[in-house]
């Protein structure tokens, strides 16, 4: 049998053998060093180098992740602060509304939004009642139509907030048009609104008012002439 532990006097060793076989004590693959506690440790040179390299790479990667995360948090805080400063300067810049109407107006507008959501829900109009026949009314069809389900809650909320805080509401619209929406889109829907509302509804309303006024004037004049003729004949 091959003895890897050299010749040892078994009578003196009491069964104890060296920790490292003799053939490996001078190997370049292993190293022995003393740690601060005074204990000696045996380590593989190549394994230690690989673990140290892997540990350094992992620490470097974690450090990059930490720096990236801190950078993202800092950028997010800057963006939030920018939004706050912008809102104070361009939207919530009316002290009287900020003190008295913005908060209650916002809460009531939120309630209006929920009310609109309830109004456009088909089940709230009795559509799921199976005991009695259900016949949809015109108002129900109008409220539960697809455009109403999309727009009605938002329209009610916007109208309510505009009633309570008109200047802040207008500032919000201006900020959205100037800084969020594309200029071409804003110009396009302004032209469309002008054509439909101002040149359409308002113009027809004024024309109808003028026609009614002219008709009334003619009728009054005719009635006065008839009355004058009757008085002359009398």
From Swiss-Prot:
Compartments in which it is found: Mitochondrion inner membrane
UniProt entry keywords in alphabetical sequence: Membrane, Mitochondrion, Mitochondrion inner membrane, Transmembrane, Transmembrane helix
Topology class, membrane: Multi-pass membrane protein
Record topological domains on the Mitochondrial intermembrane side: 1-100, 162-234
UniProt GO BP: cristae formation; positive regulation of protein oligomerization; protein-containing complex organization
Superkingdom, natural source: Eukaryota
GO cellular component, one term: mitochondrion
Mitochondrial matrix side: 121-141
Job of this protein: Component of the MICOS complex, a large protein complex of the mitochondrial inner membrane that plays crucial roles in the maintenance of crista junctions, inner membrane architecture, and formation of contact sites to the outer membrane.
Identification of the protein by name: MICOS complex subunit MIC27
Organism name: Saccharomyces cerevisiae (strain ATCC 204508 / S288c) (Baker's yeast)
